Amino acid sequence: MNLSAVIPTILGIPFDAQSSYLRGAAEAPTKIRQALACDASNHWTETGVDLGAAGIYEDGGDLEFLERDAFAAIENGADEIIRLGKRPVCLGGDHSITYPIVKAVARKYSGLTIFHFDAHPDLYDEFEGNRLSHACPFARIMEAGLAKRLVQVGIRTINRHQREQVQKFGVEVVEMSTLPAYDTLKAAGPIYITFDMDVLDPAFAPGISHREPGGMSVREAIAHLQAIEGEIVGADLVEFNPVRDVDGMTATVAAKILKEILGKMIAG
């Protein structure tokens, strides 16, 4: 599989209706773009990719949809990017958006490996009676057979039910206490990256709804992204909540993570 000509395309998904604690993540796509365009930094990634070069990636803007139609609209939006011969890079929004995105990606790319960076497994069968909560996307993905392999990195809060779900679905969990996890970040087939901003320690990223101390530094996160080996066919960046940010710190970090994901997709 040669993806060198398959351009990464950003798609903003301003949706946070499945958040269980605080809303605000719907405001993130705009804030991330503003931080990415800020003159305080240049467009070069650490892997030597100039994101300012013409045509190296595209931005498809934000999806527009009614809240009740969100999941169908998100799936269709990701599917449209794929049908145009491009790779979706979606900016949430809460983590529930990953399920409809992966539905679209899995139709094109079978045998998908998902590398999931997060403080939480998001494997609840249901949360507060809601099977589509941002606490449940990976249960939906795995029960639907959309991924061959799910690797969760940076987990540091997991209860008995979710450990049972890990066993049920054969999930590979790398808890924060056992990092680094470079050897697990290799796949022979297509790879999808989902990066929840709360994988980072809140000292580095305070602008998140579910702050969980003891997380990754920005440097650790970038090192793990750069350690990924294989063909990346899509990605998302979720759960940045600008309402809780401090002086734009988390927006800047989110833009940095986005830059390095794009750079990794382009450079291979």
How would you describe each model-predicted region?
Residues 2-268:
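Conserved alpha-helical scaffold segments that buttress catalytic/binding sites
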